[in-house]
Amino acid sequence: MRSTTRVGLVVLCVGIAAQVAAHLGDVVLAFWDAQAHLDIARRVIDSTTPGLQMLGTVWLPVPHLLYLPFTQIDPLWWNGLAGGIVGMAAFVLMAVSVHDIVRRRSERAAAAWIAVAIVACNPTLLYLQTTAMTEPLLLGFLAAATARLDHWREGGEDRLLLGAGAWTALAVGSRYDGWFFAAVAAVAVLAISRRIGPVLRFVALPAVVVAAWLVFNAVYFGDPLEFQRGIWSAASQQATLAGEGLLPTRGAPLLDLGYYLGAVGLTSGWLLLAVGTLGSLLALRHREHRVVLLLLWSVLPFNVLALFAGQSAIALPWTDPAGVLNLRYGIMLLPALAVGAVLGLEHLATRRGMLLALAVVGALQVGHFAWNWPAAVGGLREGLAIRDGDAAQMRASRWLATHYDRGRVLVAPAVNISPRTRIRLRDRVYPWTWELGPAALDAPAEVVDWVVVDRRAQGDPVTKAVAADTSFDRRFQLAFRERELEIWQRR
């Protein structure tokens, strides 16, 4: 059996075990974003207005297109496994690619397995790959692209460049980190080949994805840059945070670096951050390691620049304001730290010394995660904070999962309806839903069978509609209440 196959099977078993644990721990749907990703994929078909336009512009489309076939299977959508299947595949891809990179760079087979163990046993990544979050997908695509580029650097075969371009195209269509990686990789290809032909072969597919995204935005939303300057864009959301004084990182490069490295420490591990950084610096002295490490480390300047430009936000437990916002972004540096730690220590110690040093570091890191569980596991800590931060919404979703039987549901904009409720997306009516939304606000009993009201939200159109309907209490009965969150059922 080939070593790549063995790695894939071992990591697959680890991923499956994590999937089981996450489902038993009820954390698969902890992130609101994970639920939204599943719903976006589902609504391309299950919607009052089905079609590709339902992909929207909030997020890039590749993850939702990958989730789409699985979300059409009701049980996989309800329990979140539709996202976990794709996430686990990306998890295996990343581990196999890391093994490929280190095996090619090192003369010791054990070094590649150690790098795999570092990434495959990281608790934040193990958790995220059970969800529909997009970070594992990006890590898988970037690692695969880096492995192909490294292989091309040695052999120079054009098909390897096309393969690297294909993986990069998937990264470009998954997260904007991929756009930065594509630019860095294109420069690397040019520096290695000193010819424009190889660069064009590499960037062809990523360029097609970018062009397709611009055309999609222009055709469906009237602006090719809707994803950047629309009301749901990251820039718009961060502008709101900045207006409230909640974006201290904008325009502060050193602070940005500190924030991002804090997120790395809380997700990838503080010891690994130290050892991986030192190892990478040592490995950079060797020419053959430079391209791989620079590609894997490209996520660092991207995230720092995103914070600097106000396009991203991170909150740490010790910052002001304190929080656990987007801690998961730190996991992007995990492959770079794993590869750097192994390659760097390999040049400092004998095989036995390297194994001993990494075993000690690994034991200390695992002990830290276990001693302060789950606070020391940044991704899980963030997910739990979101899940438990609004207990009313969580209980409302669980109540609907056992009491909802049929009919349309008018939903307040601020309320998140979980896939676990089993309410089809075509039966969810929001104030903006084409034709049905305005009609439901005007006469709820004529359009819907259920109404979800959130009296906490000022100016909520559903709350206003309920208050304005003099016959509402006669036509609907209160079936559930958790603080100001109410669910009404038609009599």
Predicted region positions:
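Short hydrophobic/aromatic helix or loop-helix immediately within or flanking a transmembrane segment
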Residues: 39-40, 55-76, 89
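Hydrophobic, aromatic-rich transmembrane alpha-helices
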Residues: 190, 259-303, 340-341, 358-359
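Perimembrane helix-loop-helix junctions
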Residues: 151-155, 161, 181-210, 215, ...
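Signature aromatic-anchored transmembrane alpha helix within multi-pass, membrane-resident enzymes
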Residues: 6-12, 110, 114, 166, ...
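Short acidic/glycine- and proline-prone juxtamembrane loop motifs at membrane-interface regions
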Residues: 59, 124-137
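Membrane-lumen/periplasm interface segments of specific transmembrane helices
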Residues: 199-276, 299-303
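Membrane-embedded, lumen/periplasm-facing catalytic core of multi-pass transferases
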Residues: 361-416
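Transmembrane-helix motifs of polytopic, lipid-linked glycan transferases
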Residues: 85-106, 144, 281
